[in-house]
Every structure is written in structure tokens, then in C-alpha cells.
Amino acid sequence: MNKHHTLTKQKRKAGLLSIIPGLGQIANQQLSKGLLFLAITGLFAFELCVFGIQALTGLMTLGSVPGEDHSLFMLIEGTLQLIVTMIFLMFYIFNIHDSRKTAAMKAAGLEVNTTAKDMICHAGDKGFPYLFTLPAYIMMVFVIIFPVLVTLFVALTNYDFYHIPPNRLIDWVGFKNFLNIFFLGSYRETFVNVLGWTVIWTICATTLQIILGIVTALFVNQDFIKGKRIFRMIFLFPWAVPAFITIMSFSNMFNDSIGAVNAQVIPLFNHLPFVELPAIAWKTDPFWTKTALIMIQTWLGFPYIYVMVTGVLQAIPGELYEAAKIDGATFIQRFRHITFPMILFATAPVMITQYTFNFNNFSIIYLFNEGGPGSAGAGAGSTDILISWIYKLTTGTSPQYSVAAAVTLLISFIVIGISLIAFKKSNAFGNEEVM
């Protein structure tokens, strides 16, 4: 009973002293750690007084004097200070937990590291994984979390063509931009149209490139095919040429008036009996532009799937196919019950990332026809996907930065949500055996 009372008393004492970080550690005879914690606290307090309070105030007000206060800089600086403050709060909680834990160990008669040398050795031994990954976490904070927070805060403001700092101040407007996207007529119609085409584009282009990649891999890996190395090189050509050059070349080939498709390929087909094809409006008719985009992405994307599936096929034991042949299985049955499950099991995560990549595939949409032809409203073209619409919202004659930020967040929620569901449902992350 006395031992339990002593333990509780020591933990309470350490917790109270840890209200000022470092004092609890000093009370536990960990002088070096306590001084380090005090130094960190003092450094944060100094930073908070010199810069932090002003930055957090600026984040809340976004300035008060047009021409002098730069609202965007205040938002960015305040976000950075908010992250620094959150990191210190995590350190503060760790400080209390560490002090109480050490006090409990001492009260229980367990050995506690008190000298600087012992604590450094302990950190190098038990804390090596954390020290090794610390740079990655720091980079993640400033490369991922910081931009995401800035984007979120911009989406909650009225940052647009009429509110560009420092001449005009930015104001907080809450979730108005999100509500406008869903309920304001012009934005709602555009968002629905662009989102619908984005989904169609993602599903069609990605599925076709996956199917073509699997078919070509199966074709080349058949025993009766001779000159497999030549075929493998040929199928890699679309991947070897930079996508930028390929897209621009296709853009010229599909030109309505002087492109190779209308000027040479279609007339060549028209020499066949009973064939009379008119010139196709590849870049002036939205339907044919979308068709061309899907075909081009299929051409660009299938070599990657082909290479990946080829590796999987070569790893499948031949005995499985021999046993299936003895049992009388046809080629379709062997593919359905052996080949396809093996491919899906090994490549499902990569297949999912192909869909997420094409969902945000800005380059082909913009380079081929700049999102045209025609208009879907609110600055979007008839073939714009969400990511290219965001680009136009921020670079047009009347930029809408806050709306673009809101659409960016919606894209993130959609992609992350669908990806998490797909990854969770994928057997590639389970322990199931592929029969």
C-alpha cells in the first residue's frame, strides 16, 4: 500500500514539475535531459515572442491595412507558425509522459539513465529507428502537411482576382467556396460536367491500357512466338520516347485539316471497296477529341503494364499450366484460374495507382488541345479534367485561387478515399493464398 502511494506521489510530483518542461527530468536526476528540455522550451518561447504571436495574429486577421499588409504572406507565415506550435505541443506532452514514466521507474526500483553518456547510448540503441526516420518525418511536415494546410486555408478565403494582396486584403469566408461548387449554378454545372468526364476518362483510358498491356504480354510470352526480343523492344518504343514529344506529335497528327490521320490515313482506307470515310473533327468536336485522348493514353500507358505483367508471367511455375492442360483446361480457363489471379495478386496496388495517376493526368489533356474544344463554363473546356480546370482557374484572365484550392481538396478527398477502399479490398495486401 505504501509502495503504491509512493509511486502515485512520485508520478504526481513529476507531472506537476513538468508543467515547465525539463524540471520533471531534473527532479528525476536526469540533469542533461532536463537542461535540454529547458533549452528547447526557452528557444520556443523566444521564437513565439519575436515572431510567433505576430504570425498567429496575422493568420487570424489576414491584415488590416491594404497596401501594407500582405494577406497571403500572413497566411503562409501563420500556417508555418501553427505547425511549429503543434510540434512543440507534441514535445510538451512527451515531456510530461517521460517525466511521469521515469518517476514511476525510480519508485519501482528500476534502473534509470541519469548521465548524458548513458542517455546518448540508450537513444542510439533503443531509439535508432526513430532517429533514422526523423529526417523523413521532418520532410513530410514541410513537403506534405504544410502545403495541404495552406491549400485548406486558401480554400476558406476569398482569394481571387478582386482580392490580390497587397493592394487588396484577403478575408475569411468559411466554407462558401465549397458551397458555391455544389450549389451555385455556374460552378455546380461545370463541376458536375468536368467530374463526369474525369471519371469516364480515368476508367476508359486506364482500363484500356491495362487490357492492352496484359494482352501484349500474354502474346509475347506464348511458346509459339519467335523473335520475342524483337517484339519486346517494339512494345517498349512508346515508353522509350518522352511523353511530351509523343503527345505533341499526336496533336499534330490529329489536326483536322493537315494532320496525318485526316490527310493520309483516312484517304488510304477510302481506296478499299465500299469504304468512304469522311474527315473526322478530331480537335473541334468534343466527342472525337475525347476519343483521341483515350486512344493516345492507351498507347502511352500500356508499355508499363506490359513490362510489369511480363515479369509476373515469367515467375509463374510452368508446372501449373502443365497440370491444367492434363486436366483438360482450355486457354481461357487457364487464364481465368491461373494467369489472371496471379497477375492481379502481384500487381493490384500498381494497377490502382494507374487509375489515380490518370485521374490527375494534366499533361496529355493540356498538351493535346488545352482542354478544348468548346467550353463547359467557369473557364473549363469540354475535355478538361479536374486538374486542368484547376490550372485554368489559377492562370485565367480572372483567377479564382480560392475556388481552385477548394476543387484541389475535393480531388484529394476523392482520390484518397477511392484508393484506400481499393487498397483495402485488394487481396495483394492480405495473406490469402493464390490457388
Curated annotation (Swiss-Prot):
Q: Which gene encodes it?
A: mdxF
Which organism encodes this protein? Bacillus subtilis (strain 168)
Task: Enumerate the spans annotated as ABC transmembrane type-1 domain.
Answer: 195-422
Subunit description: The complex is composed of two ATP-binding proteins (MsmX), two transmembrane proteins (MdxF and MdxG) and a solute-binding protein (MdxE).
TM segment ranges:
35-55, 73-93, 136-156, 199-219, 234-254, 293-313, 337-357, 403-423
Q: What is a GO molecular function of this protein?
A: ABC-type maltose transporter activity
Tell me if Cytoplasm is a UniProt keyword of this record: no
Q: Which key words tag this protein in UniProt?
A: Cell membrane, Membrane, Polysaccharide transport, Sugar transport, Transmembrane, Transmembrane helix, Transport
Q: Name one GO biological process term.
A: maltodextrin transmembrane transport
Function description: Part of the ABC transporter complex involved in maltodextrin import. Probably responsible for the translocation of the substrate across the membrane.
List the GO terms this entry assigns under cellular component, sorted alphabetically: maltose transport complex
| Protein location | Cell membrane
What is the protein name given in its UniProt record? Maltodextrin transport system permease protein MdxF
Q: Which Pfam families match?
A: BPD_transp_1
The organism's superkingdom is given as Bacteria
- What membrane topology does the annotation report for this chain? Multi-pass membrane protein
The record, for SUPFAM superfamilies, names: MalF N-terminal region-like, MetI-like
The similarity comment for this entry is:
Belongs to the binding-protein-dependent transport system permease family. MalFG subfamily.
Coarse class of the primary localization is: membrane
Would the keyword Cell membrane be found if you checked this record's keyword annotation?
A: yes
